[in-house]
């Protein structure tokens, strides 16, 4: 089972709220699908993550990795039980928010 950090939960809630406000149920479903894919990838191949999102190598940190699922960049912890640390839409200002 993959855990979610409070920051990641807040980011997911904000994305869902935005999609609801904009009447974009397909986008909300795509977010859920991306999270499911990320959880599966982290559980099966935790070492396959990238050190940082490709456009932002400066975000590399020890003990965390990134993966792209759908249109989302997802950060997760690499030590201990799997924890999703952050979830960003691909065009978000990731360095400014992480």
Outline where the language-model segments fall:
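Enriched for short, Lys/Arg-rich terminal
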Residues: 67-98
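Basic, Lys/Arg-enriched alpha-helical interface segments
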Residues: 1-63, 97
């Amino acid at each position: 089972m993959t855990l979610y950090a409070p920051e990641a939960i807040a980011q997911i809630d904000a994305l869902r709220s935005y999609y609801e406000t904009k009447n974009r149920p397909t986008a909300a479903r795509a977010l859920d699908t991306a999270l499911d894919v990320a959880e599966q990838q982290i559980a099966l191949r935790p070492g396959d993550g990238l050190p940082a999102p490709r456009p932002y190598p400066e975000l590399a940190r020890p003990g965390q990795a990134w993966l792209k699922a759908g249109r989302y960049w997802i950060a997760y912890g690499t030590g201990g039980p799997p924890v999703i640390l952050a979830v960003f839409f691909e065009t978000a200002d990731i360095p400014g928010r992480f």
